[in-house]
A protein has these predicted regions:
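C-terminal outer-membrane beta-barrel translocator/porin domains of Gram-negative envelope proteins
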Residues: 227, 231, 235-314
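Interface/linker segment at the passenger-translocator junction
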Residues: 47-56, 60-69, 74-83
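Outer-membrane beta-barrel proteins
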Residues: 63-69, 99-105, 131-138, 182-190, ...
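Gram-negative/organellar outer-membrane beta-barrel architecture
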Residues: 68-77, 83-219
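Transmembrane beta-strands of outer-membrane beta-barrel proteins
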Residues: 76-78, 112-116, 141-147, 194-196, ...
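Noncatalytic linker/hinge segments flanking ATPase motor cores
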Residues: 118-127, 155-162, 183-190, 223, ...
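Outer-membrane beta-barrel transmembrane domain signature of Gram-negative proteins
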Residues: 207-234, 311-313
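Cleavable N-terminal export/targeting peptides
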Residues: 1-55, 62
Length: 314
């Protein structure tokens, strides 16, 4: 079982608000009329000055990236930043996010979203992926997807608690993984969805310093899973919620008749609650449980932590 150290990402956001003021004067005759016309035009037309200098342009870009432009058919923005963790060392991550509405006549349903992300570090770690939620007209159904590939040079102590607590078992190896998770859910009641899901996982351990720690298990595993997912979602915004609740219960099966070398099942529960405290501040609570049973391959055993779990939300 891998020991997971806290992954800390430092992202610096710089914000600036720009405002402009117009002076309205009152005179007599033609000058007064011209100023009244200018005042009327100032009330109806806003001229935004282009930022000058590289720093101001970067600040303006970050400010605009946080705004939802509902008049655009596809609102896409890119953001990136440096990070550091004890496992992967220094790196740079980039995310391109898009918001769109499949039907122009549907102005009530939440916006669909898609994100393309990439990360690379000095320790030869990399991760590439795409994920998102496509919301069908009137929110009658949703398609959720997450596809990614990653490689990391990390450490291994063995399978199970007793082996992992022995520091003498520490060994290095390279871990490559490819994961695909897709679900299609129908809305059965307000904010309640249910539907099938499928997963495909490929895991490959390479350059193992102590292969005996795997206790004869395959260094390469390929698993296909199918199951059912139930979701409750009344968040105000899917990708950056400030209020509401999201609950998801997944039950997956990886049987042998799907060509799996390891047959096992998985139950996963995810709860998240968001409550606004004051402007731009939100308290968020998260509960995550992942249980596997059966002949679970070493690479799909549950771990503590991970980059997908919340540590702070402000």
């Amino acid at each position: 079982m891998n020991r997971v150290l806290t992954f800390i990402t430092f992202v610096i956001f710089i914000g600036a608000n720009c405002s402009s003021a117009a002076d309205n004067g009152f005179g007599s005759g033609q000058l007064q009329d011209e100023r009244q016309i200018d005042s009327t035009m100032a009330d109806t037309v806003t001229v935004k000055e282009k930022p000058k200098g590289l720093i101001n342009k970067i600040i303006a870009y970050f400010n605009e990236s946080n705004k939802v432009r509902r008049n655009k058919k596809f609102d896409f923005s890119i953001i990136g930043g440096p990070h550091y963790s004890s496992d992967t060392k220094f790196g740079i991550g980039v995310v391109g996010s898009g918001l769109y509405r499949p039907s122009a006549s549907d102005s009530v349903s939440p916006l669909s979203n898609v994100s393309v992300y990439a990360d690379a570090t000095t320790s030869m770690f990399f991760k590439l992926g795409v994920r998102g939620t496509h919301i069908f007209p009137n929110d009658k159904a949703r398609l959720n997807y997450d596809i990614n590939v990653a490689q990391i040079a990390t450490k291994f102590w063995g399978i199970g608690y007793e082996m992992a607590r022995n520091d003498d078992n520490e060994s290095k190896y390279k871990y490559f993984t490819s994961q695909t998770e897709v679900s299609y859910v129908w809305r059965l009641a307000p904010n309640f969805y249910i539907g099938p899901m499928a997963t495909v996982d490929y895991i490959n351990a390479r350059d193992m310093a102590k292969p005996e720690l795997w206790e004869g298990e395959r260094d390469k595993t390929f698993n296909i899973g199918v199951g059912l997912t139930m979701q409750y979602d009344n968040r105000d915004f899917l990708t950056n919620a400030s209020r509401g609740m999201y609950a998801r219960l997944d039950q997956r099966f990886n049987p042998r008749f799907l060509a799996n070398k390891y047959a096992f099942s998985l139950t996963e529960l995810y709860l998240a609650y968001y409550h606004p405290v004051w402007k731009s501040a939100t308290i968020a609570l998260q509960l995550h449980s992942r249980l596997t049973y059966g002949n679970t391959p070493w690479g799909l055993l549950s771990t503590l932590g991970g980059s997908d779990n919340m540590r702070g939300y402000f």
